[in-house]
Amino acid sequence: MRRFSASSFLLFACFLLTPAVLAETNVVLPFANLAKDQALDWVGESICENVAEALSAEGLLVLDREDRCEVYRRMSLRQYALLTRATVIKVGEALDADHVIFGQFSVSGEPSGRRSIRLAARVLDLTRLRQSIEFSYTAPLEDLASLQVSLAWEAYRYLRPQTARSEAEFKTSRQATRIDAMENYIRGLVAPTQEQRHRLFAQAARLDPNYSQPRFQLGRWHWERENYQIAADWLKQVAASDPHYRAAAFLLGLSRYQLGDYAGAEEAFAGIAKQIPVNEVFNNLGAAQARRDRPEALENFRRALEGDESDPVYHFNVGYALWRQGEFDVAADSFRAVLDRNSGDPEATLMLGRCLKRTRARSLDARSEAGPRLKQEFNETAYLQLKEMLEAKKQ
């Protein structure tokens, strides 16, 4: 069966779907801190982050923290301040969101003793200009994790009223997290320096061995610094239920590739391809397979190229696989396509020369030989948006 990239599917869907069934976008705002203690601001960020991640894990499109923070900055809004309904609407419109989840919390009791939290939230439907009833909860502060799951369930049920998923199933799939670990993780997300972020994420991971989110952040932190073995050690601990799981698997595949573990890289990319069949995943899967001299590499490079024929990386890799198979004339056409898009590409020039001279490939271990090119960025949003659009059409 022929497979298509997310971008190809999205283009095709535009001809099938009307605006009424386009995927809906959701945003969760940081909850206002009514406790008059700025040391508790992290609670408002925690509610926002965890509800957003829970909804995302259920397949809903939820805008990320960076987008929301940028709008707050542009509108000169203070994080964790109580917003009027009019301001909430303006934030949602600035983010082009269909639904906004917002609310506030208060904490009672002495810091040195047992404290309780009261949480209240609503879902605002911007397309119909109506909002849900208020969801409110009161519990000991140490039960914050379970309160967040309860709120996420209410929001999910409001946004997906026809869901067949039960509340018990929804909650069982989410492990409780120690509140001190959660606090360190959230403080890490908002920390001003990279060193502080790393220290707080590491502390969160140490406090709760089953806490997946800081493990993803630590893996990404080390990947960005080319500490590939340490990155791989963290990334392989990210739980399958974590909304960052596929991004973690992508970075894990890249880390293993850089470490020369091509079988492990192939395993990671193949796992993602089964869920999110997008260009960059097929490309990197093909690269790992090419390093193992597997014939499937060419097929996956061609799948990536089908999704975006304007990308010189995909043309290069198709040419590389054909050259290794001794298909010099066809490979030369691929390298010419690369040079049509980037005339100053030295590797493509070298490989075209080898094809014209009919120079055969040497050992895969030859470091002087140009190898397949990787994609470093993974974006599943377009594919998930398409999936959401098609699900909406079924309803």
Predicted segments, located by residue:
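C-terminal/domain-edge helix-coil "capping" segments
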Residues: 23-27, 49, 57, 61, ...
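Short beta-strand->alpha-helix linker/helix-N-cap micro-motif
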Residues: 24-90, 94, 98-113, 130-133, ...
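Structural signature of tandem alpha-helical TPR/SEL1-like repeats
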Residues: 192-200, 224-237, 258-271, 277, ...
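Residue-level recognition of tetratricopeptide repeat
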Residues: 211, 245, 278-279, 311, ...
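TPR alpha-solenoid repeat register
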Residues: 214, 248, 281-282, 314, ...
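Terminal, low-structured helical/coil segments at or just beyond the last alpha-helical repeat
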Residues: 342-395
